[in-house]
Curated annotation (Swiss-Prot):
Family membership noted in the UniProt record: Belongs to the LDH/MDH superfamily. MDH type 1 family.
EC number: 1.1.1.37
Reactions performed catalytically: (S)-malate + NAD(+) = oxaloacetate + NADH + H(+)
Protein name per the record: Malate dehydrogenase, mitochondrial
GO biological process, one term: tricarboxylic acid cycle
Location within or outside the cell: Mitochondrion matrix
Organism of origin: Nicotiana tabacum
Any one cellular-component term (Gene Ontology): mitochondrial matrix
Source superkingdom: Eukaryota
Top class in the EC scheme: oxidoreductase
Amino acid sequence: SSEAAPEEKVAILGA
């Protein structure tokens, strides 16, 4: 997503 939702950030940062 362009504007990463909290859960998406977790997926990105927690990759």
